[in-house]
Protein backbone atom coordinates (compact mmCIF):
# COMPACT_ATOMS: atom_id res chain seq x y z
CA UNK A 1 0.00 0.00 0.00
CA UNK A 2 2.62 2.54 -1.01
CA UNK A 3 1.39 6.12 -1.23
CA UNK A 4 2.65 9.22 -3.01
CA UNK A 5 1.92 12.00 -0.53
CA UNK A 6 2.55 14.79 -3.04
CA UNK A 7 -1.11 14.85 -4.00
CA UNK A 8 -2.26 15.41 -0.44
CA UNK A 9 0.35 17.79 0.93
CA UNK A 10 -1.77 20.83 0.21
CA UNK A 11 -4.91 19.33 1.75
CA UNK A 12 -5.34 20.30 5.38
CA UNK A 13 -8.30 18.00 6.01
CA UNK A 14 -7.99 14.47 4.71
CA UNK A 15 -9.99 11.30 5.32
CA UNK A 16 -8.11 8.03 4.97
CA UNK A 17 -10.49 5.15 4.38
CA UNK A 18 -9.22 1.62 5.01
CA UNK A 19 -10.97 -1.16 3.15
CA UNK A 20 -11.92 -4.26 5.11
CA UNK A 21 -9.20 -6.17 3.26
CA UNK A 22 -6.63 -3.79 4.71
CA UNK A 23 -7.21 -5.46 8.08
CA UNK A 24 -8.13 -9.03 7.08
CA UNK A 25 -6.69 -10.08 3.74
CA UNK A 26 -8.06 -12.64 1.35
CA UNK A 27 -7.13 -16.16 2.38
CA UNK A 28 -6.34 -15.26 5.98
CA UNK A 29 -8.14 -16.72 8.99
CA UNK A 30 -8.54 -13.26 10.51
CA UNK A 31 -6.68 -13.92 13.76
CA UNK A 32 -5.94 -10.96 16.01
CA UNK A 33 -2.22 -11.24 15.27
CA UNK A 34 -2.94 -11.13 11.52
CA UNK A 35 -5.14 -8.07 11.97
CA UNK A 36 -2.45 -6.24 13.95
CA UNK A 37 0.19 -7.14 11.36
CA UNK A 38 -1.97 -5.89 8.49
CA UNK A 39 -2.92 -2.72 10.36
CA UNK A 40 0.76 -2.01 11.03
CA UNK A 41 1.41 -2.15 7.29
CA UNK A 42 -1.46 0.24 6.55
CA UNK A 43 -0.24 2.62 9.26
CA UNK A 44 3.08 3.07 7.47
CA UNK A 45 1.19 4.80 4.65
CA UNK A 46 -0.97 6.73 7.12
CA UNK A 47 2.08 7.99 9.01
CA UNK A 48 3.46 9.34 5.72
CA UNK A 49 0.27 11.34 5.25
CA UNK A 50 0.47 12.68 8.80
CA UNK A 51 4.12 13.66 8.35
CA UNK A 52 3.15 15.70 5.29
CA UNK A 53 1.17 18.01 7.59
CA UNK A 54 -2.37 16.81 7.00
CA UNK A 55 -5.08 16.74 9.61
CA UNK A 56 -6.62 13.30 9.15
CA UNK A 57 -9.65 11.26 10.06
CA UNK A 58 -9.52 7.49 9.54
CA UNK A 59 -12.53 5.41 8.58
CA UNK A 60 -12.49 1.68 7.96
CA UNK A 61 -14.53 -1.28 6.86
CA UNK A 62 -15.31 -4.13 9.21
CA UNK A 63 -14.82 -6.76 6.51
CA UNK A 64 -15.47 -10.23 7.88
CA UNK A 65 -15.21 -9.02 11.49
CA UNK A 66 -18.91 -8.31 12.03
CA UNK A 67 -19.83 -11.53 10.24
CA UNK A 68 -17.47 -13.47 12.51
CA UNK A 69 -19.08 -11.91 15.57
CA UNK A 70 -22.46 -12.92 14.22
CA UNK A 71 -21.22 -16.51 13.78
CA UNK A 72 -19.90 -16.50 17.36
CA UNK A 73 -23.31 -15.26 18.49
CA UNK A 74 -25.07 -18.12 16.79
CA UNK A 75 -22.60 -20.75 17.97
CA UNK A 76 -23.09 -19.74 21.60
CA UNK A 77 -26.83 -19.01 21.39
CA UNK A 78 -27.69 -21.97 23.63
CA UNK A 79 -25.37 -20.66 26.35
CA UNK A 80 -25.76 -16.87 26.29
CA UNK A 81 -28.36 -14.55 24.71
CA UNK A 82 -27.26 -13.55 21.19
CA UNK A 83 -26.71 -9.86 20.57
CA UNK A 84 -28.59 -7.97 17.83
CA UNK A 85 -26.69 -7.09 14.69
CA UNK A 86 -26.30 -3.39 15.53
CA UNK A 87 -24.52 -4.39 18.75
CA UNK A 88 -22.21 -6.59 16.66
CA UNK A 89 -21.61 -3.52 14.47
CA UNK A 90 -20.57 -1.58 17.58
CA UNK A 91 -18.37 -4.42 18.84
CA UNK A 92 -16.49 -4.62 15.55
CA UNK A 93 -16.12 -0.84 15.36
CA UNK A 94 -14.56 -0.79 18.82
CA UNK A 95 -12.24 -3.77 18.38
CA UNK A 96 -10.99 -2.73 14.93
CA UNK A 97 -10.66 0.85 16.16
CA UNK A 98 -8.36 -0.38 18.92
CA UNK A 99 -6.25 -2.39 16.48
CA UNK A 100 -5.80 0.61 14.17
CA UNK A 101 -5.32 3.09 17.03
CA UNK A 102 -2.64 1.03 18.77
CA UNK A 103 -0.86 0.21 15.51
CA UNK A 104 -0.77 3.87 14.46
CA UNK A 105 0.35 4.97 17.93
CA UNK A 106 3.30 2.58 17.76
CA UNK A 107 4.15 3.61 14.20
CA UNK A 108 4.15 7.32 15.03
CA UNK A 109 6.40 6.72 18.03
CA UNK A 110 8.79 4.79 15.79
CA UNK A 111 9.11 7.75 13.41
CA UNK A 112 9.14 10.34 16.22
CA UNK A 113 5.80 11.99 15.47
CA UNK A 114 3.71 13.13 18.43
CA UNK A 115 -0.02 13.08 17.74
CA UNK A 116 -2.94 12.10 19.93
CA UNK A 117 -5.20 9.38 18.52
CA UNK A 118 -8.73 8.47 19.55
CA UNK A 119 -11.44 6.12 18.33
CA UNK A 120 -14.97 7.56 18.35
CA UNK A 121 -17.78 5.01 18.40
CA UNK A 122 -19.97 6.48 15.68
CA UNK A 123 -23.73 6.26 15.23
CA UNK A 124 -25.16 6.84 11.77
CA UNK A 125 -28.80 7.77 11.28
CA UNK A 126 -30.67 5.94 8.52
CA UNK A 127 -34.15 6.52 7.14
CA UNK A 128 -36.60 3.78 8.24
CA UNK A 129 -38.44 4.27 4.94
CA UNK A 130 -35.28 3.56 2.91
CA UNK A 131 -36.14 1.04 0.19
CA UNK A 132 -33.20 -1.10 1.33
CA UNK A 133 -35.35 -2.29 4.23
CA UNK A 134 -37.93 -3.62 1.78
CA UNK A 135 -35.37 -5.63 -0.17
CA UNK A 136 -32.42 -6.66 2.06
CA UNK A 137 -29.40 -7.68 0.00
CA UNK A 138 -26.35 -7.69 2.31
CA UNK A 139 -25.42 -11.28 3.33
CA UNK A 140 -24.01 -11.83 6.81
CA UNK A 141 -23.13 -14.72 9.06
CA UNK A 142 -22.92 -18.46 8.44
CA UNK A 143 -24.54 -20.65 5.81
CA UNK A 144 -27.57 -22.81 6.72
CA UNK A 145 -29.32 -25.70 5.05
CA UNK A 146 -32.86 -25.16 3.78
CA UNK A 147 -34.61 -26.55 6.86
CA UNK A 148 -32.61 -24.41 9.28
CA UNK A 149 -33.21 -21.36 7.07
CA UNK A 150 -36.97 -21.93 7.16
CA UNK A 151 -36.93 -22.23 10.96
CA UNK A 152 -34.87 -19.05 11.38
CA UNK A 153 -37.14 -17.19 9.00
CA UNK A 154 -40.22 -18.35 10.92
CA UNK A 155 -38.92 -17.97 14.48
CA UNK A 156 -36.74 -14.87 14.19
CA UNK A 157 -38.20 -13.09 11.21
CA UNK A 158 -34.92 -13.19 9.32
CA UNK A 159 -34.84 -12.77 5.57
CA UNK A 160 -32.93 -15.73 4.15
CA UNK A 161 -31.59 -15.98 0.60
CA UNK A 162 -29.99 -18.89 -1.15
CA UNK A 163 -26.47 -19.05 -2.45
CA UNK A 164 -26.74 -21.73 -5.12
CA UNK A 165 -23.43 -23.27 -4.16
CA UNK A 166 -23.26 -23.05 -0.38
CA UNK A 167 -26.74 -22.88 1.15
CA UNK A 168 -28.79 -20.09 2.73
CA UNK A 169 -27.62 -16.94 4.52
CA UNK A 170 -29.33 -14.16 6.36
CA UNK A 171 -29.51 -10.92 4.38
CA UNK A 172 -29.98 -7.50 5.95
CA UNK A 173 -30.65 -4.01 4.71
CA UNK A 174 -27.83 -1.67 3.73
CA UNK A 175 -29.56 1.74 3.85
CA UNK A 176 -27.94 5.04 2.90
CA UNK A 177 -26.70 7.11 5.86
CA UNK A 178 -28.40 10.48 6.31
CA UNK A 179 -26.62 11.87 9.39
CA UNK A 180 -23.48 11.14 11.40
CA UNK A 181 -24.50 11.72 15.02
CA UNK A 182 -20.99 12.37 16.34
CA UNK A 183 -19.83 14.47 13.36
CA UNK A 184 -19.52 17.64 15.45
CA UNK A 185 -17.12 16.21 18.02
CA UNK A 186 -15.19 14.36 15.30
CA UNK A 187 -14.68 17.66 13.47
CA UNK A 188 -13.63 19.52 16.63
CA UNK A 189 -11.12 16.85 17.63
CA UNK A 190 -9.64 16.80 14.14
CA UNK A 191 -9.31 20.58 14.08
CA UNK A 192 -7.41 20.35 17.38
CA UNK A 193 -4.86 18.05 15.76
CA UNK A 194 -6.17 14.75 17.08
CA UNK A 195 -6.11 11.80 14.68
CA UNK A 196 -9.69 10.51 14.83
CA UNK A 197 -10.77 6.98 13.92
CA UNK A 198 -14.50 7.06 13.20
CA UNK A 199 -17.42 5.53 11.30
CA UNK A 200 -15.84 2.09 11.42
CA UNK A 201 -17.74 -0.39 9.31
CA UNK A 202 -19.99 2.47 8.22
CA UNK A 203 -20.92 3.23 11.83
CA UNK A 204 -23.70 1.81 13.99
CA UNK A 205 -27.03 2.25 12.16
CA UNK A 206 -29.70 3.99 14.21
CA UNK A 207 -33.15 5.42 13.63
CA UNK A 208 -34.02 8.87 14.98
CA UNK A 209 -37.52 9.44 16.35
CA UNK A 210 -39.56 12.63 15.95
CA UNK A 211 -38.39 13.54 19.47
CA UNK A 212 -34.76 13.10 18.47
CA UNK A 213 -34.27 9.82 20.34
CA UNK A 214 -32.03 7.15 18.84
CA UNK A 215 -32.53 3.39 18.62
CA UNK A 216 -30.37 0.77 16.94
CA UNK A 217 -31.56 -1.08 13.87
CA UNK A 218 -30.30 -4.35 12.40
CA UNK A 219 -28.61 -3.21 9.21
CA UNK A 220 -25.15 -2.62 7.75
CA UNK A 221 -24.20 0.82 6.43
CA UNK A 222 -21.79 0.93 3.50
CA UNK A 223 -18.46 2.28 4.71
CA UNK A 224 -17.89 4.37 1.59
CA UNK A 225 -21.25 6.15 1.84
CA UNK A 226 -20.62 6.89 5.52
CA UNK A 227 -17.13 8.15 4.71
CA UNK A 228 -18.43 10.47 1.99
CA UNK A 229 -21.13 11.85 4.30
CA UNK A 230 -18.67 12.41 7.13
CA UNK A 231 -16.22 14.04 4.73
CA UNK A 232 -18.89 16.49 3.63
CA UNK A 233 -19.83 17.43 7.19
CA UNK A 234 -16.26 17.93 8.42
CA UNK A 235 -15.37 19.75 5.17
CA UNK A 236 -12.59 17.36 4.18
CA UNK A 237 -10.69 18.30 1.04
CA UNK A 238 -9.44 14.83 0.15
CA UNK A 239 -10.56 11.23 0.65
CA UNK A 240 -7.92 8.53 0.21
CA UNK A 241 -8.96 4.89 -0.11
CA UNK A 242 -6.35 2.35 0.98
CA UNK A 243 -7.39 -0.99 -0.49
CA UNK A 244 -6.00 -4.32 -1.59
CA UNK A 245 -5.75 -3.17 -5.23
CA UNK A 246 -3.52 -0.49 -6.70
CA UNK A 247 -6.21 1.45 -8.57
CA UNK A 248 -9.73 1.38 -10.00
CA UNK A 249 -10.08 -0.94 -12.98
CA UNK A 250 -12.44 -1.10 -15.93
CA UNK A 251 -13.52 -4.71 -16.64
CA UNK A 252 -11.89 -5.71 -13.35
CA UNK A 253 -10.88 -9.35 -13.11
CA UNK A 254 -11.06 -9.99 -16.84
CA UNK A 255 -8.27 -10.47 -19.35
CA UNK A 256 -9.05 -7.02 -20.75
CA UNK A 257 -9.03 -5.10 -17.45
CA UNK A 258 -7.64 -1.59 -17.71
CA UNK A 259 -6.46 0.65 -14.91
CA UNK A 260 -8.08 4.06 -14.42
CA UNK A 261 -5.81 6.52 -12.62
CA UNK A 262 -8.03 9.56 -13.09
CA UNK A 263 -11.64 10.12 -14.08
CA UNK A 264 -14.09 12.98 -14.10
CA UNK A 265 -17.43 12.84 -12.29
CA UNK A 266 -19.13 12.52 -15.69
CA UNK A 267 -16.95 9.55 -16.62
CA UNK A 268 -17.54 7.90 -13.24
CA UNK A 269 -21.30 8.17 -13.73
CA UNK A 270 -21.03 6.69 -17.21
CA UNK A 271 -19.03 3.74 -15.88
CA UNK A 272 -21.65 3.19 -13.18
CA UNK A 273 -24.48 3.26 -15.71
CA UNK A 274 -22.65 0.66 -17.80
CA UNK A 275 -22.26 -1.61 -14.77
CA UNK A 276 -18.46 -1.38 -14.67
CA UNK A 277 -18.36 -1.21 -10.87
CA UNK A 278 -20.14 -3.96 -8.96
CA UNK A 279 -22.25 -2.99 -5.91
CA UNK A 280 -20.08 -2.95 -2.80
CA UNK A 281 -16.82 -2.76 -4.76
CA UNK A 282 -14.27 0.00 -4.33
Residue ranges and their predicted role:
Residues 32-35, 71-81, 134-142, 211-219, ...:
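A glycine- and small-aliphatic-rich helix-loop capping segment at beta-alpha/alpha-beta transitions
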Residues 37-49, 85-103, 107-108, 173-190, ...:
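Polyanion-binding loop/helix "lid" in catalytic or ligand-binding cores
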Residues 203, 234-252:
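Glycine-rich phosphate/pyrophosphate-binding loops
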Residues 76-196:
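Ligand-binding beta-strand-loop-alpha-helix segment within the catalytic cores
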Residues 63, 67-78, 253-254:
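Glycine-rich loop at the start of a catalytic domain that most often binds anionic cofactors/ligands
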Residues 1-59, 69-70, 74, 188-191:
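N-terminal glycine-/serine-/threonine-rich phosphate-binding loop
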Residues 22-24, 63-67, 125-128, 204-206, ...:
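Short, active-site-adjacent cap segments at secondary-structure transitions
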Residues 15-17, 55-68, 116-121, 196-199, ...:
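Short beta-strand segments at enzyme active-site cores
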